[in-house]
Amino acid sequence: MLVSDIEANNLLEKVTKFHCGVIYDYRDGEYHSYRPGDFGAYLDALEAEVKRGGLIVFHNGHKYDVPALTKLAKLQLNREFHLPRENCIDTLVLSRLIHSNLKDTDMGLLRSGKLPGKRFGSHALEAWGYRLGEMKGEYKDDFKRMLEEQGEEYVDGMEWWNFNEEMMDYNVQDVVVTKALLEKLLSDKHYFPPEIDFTDVGYTTFWSESLEAVDVEHRAAWLLAKQERNGFPFDTKAIEELYVELAARRSELLRNLTETFGSWYQPKGGTEMFCHPRTGKPLPKYPRIKIPKVGGIFKKPKNKAQREGREPCELDTREYVAGAPYTPVEHVVFNPSSRDHIQKKLQEAGWVPTKFTDKGAPVVDDEVLEGVRVDDPEKQAAIDLIKEYLMIQKRIGQSAEGDKAWLRYVAEDGKIHGSVNPNGAVTGRATHAFPNLAQIPGVRSPYGEQCRAAFGAEHHLDGITGKPWVQAGIDASGLELRCLAHFMARFDNGEYAHEILNGDIHTKNQMAAELPTRDNAKTFIYGFLYGAGDEKIGQIVGAGKERGKELKKKFLENTPAIAALRESIQQTLVESSQWVAGEQQVKWKRRWIKGLDGRKVHVRSPHAALNTLLQSAGALICKLWIIKTEEMLVEKGLKHGWDGDFAYMAWIHDEIQVACRTEEIAKTVIEVAQEAMRWVGEHWNFRCLLDTEGKMGANWKECH
């Protein structure tokens, strides 16, 4: 086994120069350094390990080192170089798997000062250097310090422009940290049987003897790194035109809002608490006041006649009277960009906030206001005006003006290469960033059709025929309920699963919760499964917290298998639990449930356990599904990539969007995805049949 790391002059898309590389070889126990002129020898050493059937360990290798080496070998040496997936271990992938609850375990290190705040919850190699006590400083910080001492100005990224010996030293230190991290990860007995020395085995033994989750996460990371490099073809012109339309509507709304809400006076500048006139008790709910020390109705007498009252004193022209409290105010013009102004006007119109920030301010966004209704038509019109403004502002932020706006992330190839963390959530779900492609508005949302249509295989023209590619969108059918049915089957002999496949599960749930409509039942069950509180559940039928609590109670009484499942989970996790001063104090047996692939899925609280179990099951099913789909397509002789037959563009929770060179290939992808999903169900002995639905079209609007 080799542990390695490279330094180069840029990120993957712009990298052109290999600076240095380091290998730690477990066979001789030595660190081997390779400078710019040794690039060929470095590649030879890696290839020799592959030929031996060995393993090469990088940190973030799947996403950076491995594809960067392929690119640099061609650029600098005109050499074909490809490391096979099965020969590569990524400690970043392992860290995210084994320490998915890192933020919980980092608190002690943060308090003790062992871990800097900027590294809290981070899986980066530098963060692990601090945790493991192997950190010897950070190259970028030291480089900046050196420039400062020399009186030179730092330009962002310049530390990677040219090779230097300090870089070589840090490269060695990175491998020291990677080795220490690897050994820490391999010592976890849950994932790696302790009787095997995993640093002294070939790749076949490593993958077959470690827990299945280790293999699943590495395969997913490899595939999703490929998806990132593929990118999602994007219609820049269409979104620029949409931006013009949205900006015009925003200007119109700004005028309407300012006219509708005008201006008002509000307290500002008071320095003292207002006290009750009779009791003298401070009244904190009232605005702060000022109590003048000077001023009056009349000025002091300035001659004998005024003192004797024969002549009136002059009027005091000062604005205040000494000892007479007043509330200072300011004149405010409505500002639609101010959340404080918006929530003030909404509450005046009759809106009662139910969701608050950590600091106690009402949360104001288009989603929170979606269901707000008041009886007064004028006030409702005012609320609707604000709702539309917030929605327009959100669309503008997503598409054009925000830091992570789509237009800011279109690469030179006309595609958006969104970042995916394959195990970003504690449940095993992926998370998305730069930009977040999981938050593209749906086709039923305002402007959703234009947004989705901009992402599409049709925007990629084939390099040979010049024809647009075809899109295949496939999603898992009713996954949440099928996962619930799988876990309920032990308690109801598969009755719930049978109803899903052969009956009408939403009508069954409607009757169980005694809800007025089938649509209410659909909203209820998904809210229930995702851990919605009593207040949220009550809102489904236009009521509050008490009604929500009652609906849950009825549902559990009439669906005893779910109640039994919840009880079973509680018994597995919790030794004892009691409520003290409104807080649940739990004595845990253990704080994790077993995922479908054997992993530990960490649970934050007992009431979230069922939701965690179901979300994890859905995430892992889809993860293995996308892996198996690609594997089966390749087995059919199809090539993955824009230079081949199909290209993964996005995986969002339970759906994949795949670009295909022809309609025939798109049909094959849809068929194979269904076969792969059935294979996953059989592989994990799922107690409810798993299915997919596929659509073929030109873009995401047509394929979801």
Curated annotation (Swiss-Prot):
Pfam families with a match to the protein in the record: DNA_pol_A
Keyword Cytoplasm carried by entry: no
Annotated residues for binding of substrate: H506, R518, K522, Y526
Record keywords: DNA replication, DNA-binding, DNA-directed DNA polymerase, Exonuclease, Hydrolase, Magnesium, Metal-binding, Multifunctional enzyme, Nuclease, Nucleotidyltransferase, Transferase, Viral DNA replication
Annotated Mg(2+) 3 binding sites: D475, D654
Renumbered residue ranges of the record's region 3'-5'exonuclease: 1-187
Molecular function GO labels: 3'-5' exonuclease activity; DNA binding; DNA-directed DNA polymerase activity; metal ion binding; nucleotide binding
E.C. designation(s): 2.7.7.7, 3.1.11.-
Annotated segments matching region Polymerase: 202-704
InterPro entries, per the entry: DNA-dir_DNA_pol_A_CS, DNA-dir_DNA_pol_A_palm_dom, DNA/RNA_pol_sf, DNA_polymerase_A, DPOL_T7, RNaseH-like_sf, RNaseH_sf
Superkingdom of the source species: Viruses
Annotated positions binding Mg(2+) 4: D475, A476, D654
Reported cofactor(s): Mg(2+)
One Gene Ontology term from the biological process aspect of the record: viral DNA genome replication
Binding locations of Mg(2+) 1: D5
PROSITE patterns the UniProt entry points to: DNA_POLYMERASE_A (PS00447)
Chain residues that bind Mg(2+) 2: D5, E7, D174
Catalysed reactions, as listed in the record: DNA(n) + a 2'-deoxyribonucleoside 5'-triphosphate = DNA(n+1) + diphosphate
Function of the molecule: Replicates viral genomic DNA. This polymerase possesses two enzymatic activities: DNA synthesis (polymerase) and an exonucleolytic activity that degrades single-stranded DNA in the 3'-5' direction.
Family, per entry: Belongs to the DNA polymerase type-A family.
Assembly behavior: Composed of two subunits. One is encoded by the phage and the other is encoded by the host thioredoxin.
Name assigned to this protein: DNA-directed DNA polymerase
